[in-house]
Structure formats: structure tokens, C-alpha cells
UniProtKB/Swiss-Prot annotation:
Transmembrane segments: none annotated. This is LPS-assembly protein LptD. It is found in: Cell outer membrane. Residues 1-18 form the signal peptide. Component of the lipopolysaccharide transport and assembly complex. Interacts with LptE and LptA. PANTHER family: LPS-ASSEMBLY PROTEIN, LPS-ASSEMBLY PROTEIN LPTD. InterPro entries: LipoPS_assembly_LptD, LptD, LptD_C, OstA-like_N.
Amino acid sequence: MQIRYFLALSLLPNIVLADEPTTTEAPSLQCVVAPPVSRSFEDREALTGISDDQIVIISDHSSVAYNNQAEFSGDVSFSQGLRHIAADNAVLDQKEQRLNADGNLIFKDELFTVTADTLEAQMSTNNATLKGAQYWLHGQQVHGDAEKLQITSDNNLLLTKTNFTTCPPGDESWLLEADMIKIDSKEEWGEIWNAKLRIANIPVLYIPYMTVPVSDKRKTGFLFPSFSTSTTNGVEVSTPYYWNIAPEFDLTFTPDFMSSRGLYTKTEFRYLAGEQQNGQFNVEYLGSDSKLTSNADRYLYHWSHQGAVNKNWRVRSDYTDVSDNNYFNDLNSDVNQSTDNQLSRIGEASYFERDWDFNMRVQDIKVLGEDEKPYQVMPQLNFNYRSADIFNTIDFKFNSELTNFRHQDNEYNTATRLHLVPSLIWPIQGPAGSFTSEVKLLQTQYWQQNIDEDSTLNDSISRTIPQARLHGQVNFERATQLFDEQYRQTLEPQIQYLYVGYEDQSNIGIYDTAQLQEDYYGLFRDRQYSGLDRVADANQFTLGFTTRLFDQTNREKLKFSVGQIMYLEDSKVSIDDTYEETAQSTSVLAAELDAQLYNDWFVSGSVQHDTETGENKKNEVTLDYRPSSDRLLQLSYRYVPDLLNTNTNDQVDISQAGVRTSWPISDNLYFVGNYYYDLNESRNIETYTGVQYESCCWALRLSYHYRIKTNYDDDLSESIDGREEFESGVYLNFVIKGLGGSGPLGVDDMLNEGLFNYRKPLYLRN
């Protein structure tokens, strides 16, 4: 079992680009850390008509000596601009421009409040030294003690023999002690030398140098290190370094030493390009992975970019590459999750006008663990035109696509495809229904190259397919009563007739085409396959209806849909042209349900049932109990037959049941857990259990996970059998709150831990 203890001391801000608008959620719990207030401050604030450079002194008693020294006593208030000093006694040397004060001393300006035993201030330079000080940063939870506190002329703080915390006074949950701390008020950042972290008054960590934020402002420097140990990776030490290059650029470099694997480095560079574009680069590298017998180098490259060039042009790019199929399984990448098995590489530029648009795209998809590689789109050009209300009744659309398919393996054939689709639509809209008539002409031209001599493919193919579609829907409504409650019920039947002409397409290769799902909304599609390499002939009716229940406040309480296709003729087109399908008179019966059963109980489900064979093609159901936003209990089941196992190329049935919960044990203590079980294999495939305690200044999370791993064949291991089938681990996270952008751990991210992330399954219109 993998055992991992992770100490995440999140003294770090949520690093964002400075020019990028952000919102920071307020912590759910905040410590009340209030600095002391002197009555003399209120007396000073009551005075008006005083400029910032004038000095105001208020006291019960005063005297002036022959040597230009003035002495004040009894509730002394000394003010200049935004700086205020309250004390029992004060001496002002006008010649030396020096002020000394003691006795119940309080210093305050716009950034911090300090109490101290003594104060010595140089008014000409705005420097001040306070001894025996306690300090509070305004607008933050940060406060602490210092043997000596110096305020510089530019309003920075220099603290000697000091400490700080974000917990309330008297709460020693955590405390950071240091020989010296410098707080830059302009940069809103702190530098710390020779720091010692105490948790529950026990020293747990020594740090010779570190930087921390005192606000959300970013600054170059080392971020707080993280430490972990595991039986898989050994001892891990990560020390991120953040470089604030410019307002529009920043970089984070994270060396992560793993005793079982070696030095793993992660670099992230982010940028803003103008006002409407942004992107980032990621480079991750592990040299000579000592965990593998081959000691192979492992790496990742990633680039993403998106935005608008002007009001018409949009651009987007995304590229990721890894060294091996199991990169995400073995390493904690910042780019993808361990369950991701596809890397999409895409570059796209689009131009938009009111009546037309144009798009250019190149795409390559890398599928991890599969020997057969998909075709590359190099490139694809799309042009679309639309004109509404021709003769005040008819809409005209013209869609076109020119695609060049290439393959990394030279043994595969390649192709260029031109697809043109003019269409006429006659929509009729009424207050209680609609009827749409549509005709299309699908004209496609293929030029195929590198064809084997024994292949059935042709060099040049022209395909012309007519299509007609009629779709009508009526909305009925009535008042009804259910369980002594008044509701408004709708009945929304719809019917569609679809005709698609037949043409033999066995001489066309498969480049980007796959079977589409037959859910309820898919029954009313005009196509059976994605892509354009196969256009299934059709002569069919689709019947379906949806019914809804609305309460008296117009909140949707139930939605149920069911539908089925009736085939007038058998389709003669399939992806596998050698496979003869069994003639069926109907499609699957597809039904979907979303309902609020009672107060806090919700159910959601779908089924695809073959009425001719009596078998279910797919079904899933979830039952949710949500009495409040932080309380959840979810039961789920899903069944999918004949799913392809990419490792073995076998067909497998998926039959899985699960339970997921999030529940507060007390005001500060939460429990999150999930459990998923494979009914066919009779085994646990995932367990996650976590408890989290959160106070106003710190949070602690302890969690355990056990889950099946998705391992792939690759060149780095002799066989897939040598890899662990399951992964388990224990995690301990400790988070400090109240500094900069640091906030609560939150429960939502715990719900999303694991293979089966939580998703709210309800689609009621509320």
C-alpha cells in the first residue's frame, strides 16, 4: 500500500496574472483579530481643517524646556497625516526632529497597528523604532510579537526576533518564529530569515529563507516548500520558485526531488497577449527514472493559447505531448489527470460575420495505450453562410468543409475530402407548437491516396445524397393535483420523419467517423454517425414525448422523456462494411428522468432498451439526498454492455454501483467518502474516505484512497503485468489560512477526488 503524508503549508497566494481580473472567495471561517484602539485617536479624528504635513499634539499636561524639548503626559496623542501615536508620556525634541514615547504606547497608520514599550521616531525621515512590540496588519489576520520593530521612511517593516500567526490571541495552533522579517508595504510581500514553524507549540520545520504574501499581490521569490513520503516515490521535497517577470508574464519553477525516481522538475510560464488573449507553457522533466529498469527519461510539453484578435477573429491552440503512455499514471503532472488517455493537439483560427463565418483548423489526437493512431486533420477549412427569411418564410444555409487527412504511419491511405451542404428550412412557429420542414443536398468528393492494391477503396469518389426532414412538436398544458399539491403539467409530443438517400460507401475509408449514442435527444438527430465518411440511409419516423411538472412557484419538479425510431426500411450503411446487421423495425427505446421526489430527494436516470431483444443497451440511475448545500448522499448505478477494453481488445460489460457522501460532523469537521463496486468482477474499484477539520486560521485533512489503475503497454516496462493493478494511499494535508490568497480547503475538491468525480445529475429548470 502506498503511504503518503503530504504537508501543504499554504502560505501562498492564488497566483494570478496581475492584469487579469480575479475574484477571491471569502473564507467560510475568519478569525477575529482586532488591534487595540486608543480614545485619543477618536479625539484626533474629530479635528478638521488640518493638512497632512501638520503635526497635532493633544495631551492632558505639557511643558516646554529651554533646550527646545517639549514634554507631554497624560493621554498623549501625536498625529501627522495618517500616522497616529498614543502614549502616557512623550518627549519632542524640535531641534533634532525626534520623538520619544512610552507607557501604554499605540502606533497606527493606514497599514498596521503596533503596541510597544518604547518608541523613538525621527520625524524628518519618517523612521521609527519600537521595542517590545506587538503588531497587527490591517485587512489581514496577521499579527505577532517582535523584540524590535523598525518602520522605514517608505513605510516598510523590519522585525527582529519576531513571530507571527493568523490565529486569535492565545491560540497557539500554529506560529512562525524568525530571526528577522521584512514586510514591504508597497509590494505587500514579506521576506523571512531563519524561520521555525511551530504547530501546537511543537517545532516541526526549519526554513532558512522564505517569502510570504501579506495580500494577493504577486512577487518574485520562493514559495512555501512541500514535503511528502511514499512507498512508491520515496521522500519527496518540492520547493517552488515564483518569478514575477512583468505585469503580463510570470513563471513558476518547481524542482521535486523523489528519492525513488530522481529529480522531477516542473515549469509553468503564463502570459497575457494584449487585452483579449492569454496562454501558458508547461515543461516537465524527470531524467533517468530510477523506478524503471530502463532508467528512461520522462517528460511533458504543453502549450495552450486562446483569445480574440479583434471583434471578428478568434484563435485557439492546445498542444500536449508526453514521453510514454503511463506518464500521468506515475507522476503528479500539473497538466492532466491520471485518468486522461487522450492528448488533443489543435490549432484553430475563426472569423465571424453576421451572415457567415470561416474556420481553419489542424488537429492531431494522441491516444495513450493504443497502437492504432487516429488520422490527423492537416488542415480543415470550414465556410458557413446563412440567410434568414427568404420570401419572409424560408431560411437558407450553406455549409462547406475541405479536410486533408494525414497519418503518421506511411502504410495507411490518406485522403482529401470536400463536403458541400446547401439546405432550405421552412420553420413555422406557433404559441403552442412548431413545425419545421428541411431539405438538404449532401455533396461529397473524396480524393484518396496510397491505397493498397487489394483494397476496395477508390482513388476518386463523388457522393451525392439527398435528405428531407419534417419535425413537429405540440405543447399541451393542464392543471393537476398530485399528493394534495397543485401542479402545472405539460405534455410535449414530437414527431419526426427523416429520409436520407442511399449510396454505397464501401469504397470510402474511415477517417473521422464513429457511431453516435442513441439517447433521447439523439433519436431526433438527422445522422447516425459522427464525421462524414458514412452517411447512413434512412426512411424512418421518430415518436417521442416529454412531460413536466411545475409547482405553484413555477419550479420544475419532474421531467420525463421517452422516444423511439420506427424504421420503414433497413439501413444498408455501416462503419464495418463486411458486417451485416440484423434487420430491426425499431431503434432502442430511450427514456430519461429527472425528478425532485420529495423536498431534498432527487432522482435522475436514463435507459436505452432494445425492445426486440429485450436487452438493455445502457442504463444509469442516481439517487441524491441534499438537505443543504454542504450535505450530500448519492447512490448510483450504471450499466454499459460490450465496451471495448483498449488493452486487450475484448468486449466487456460495465456494471458498477457506488455511493458518495459529504456530511458535516460538526461546525468545523466534515466527512467525505465514496465507494464504487464492480458487480461483474465482484471487486472494489475505488474507495475514498476523508475527514477535514477547519478552524479560522488552519485546516487539516486526512484522507485514504484505494482505486484501480489504468495501466497501458509502453516501451518503458517489459509488460503491463509488472505494474500495480491497484493504488492506495493515505494523505495528510495541513493548510494555514489568513495569509494573502490562502483560504479554506473546501469540500468540493474532496468530492472530485478519484476516478468518479461528483457531478450533479439534475437538469431541472429551476
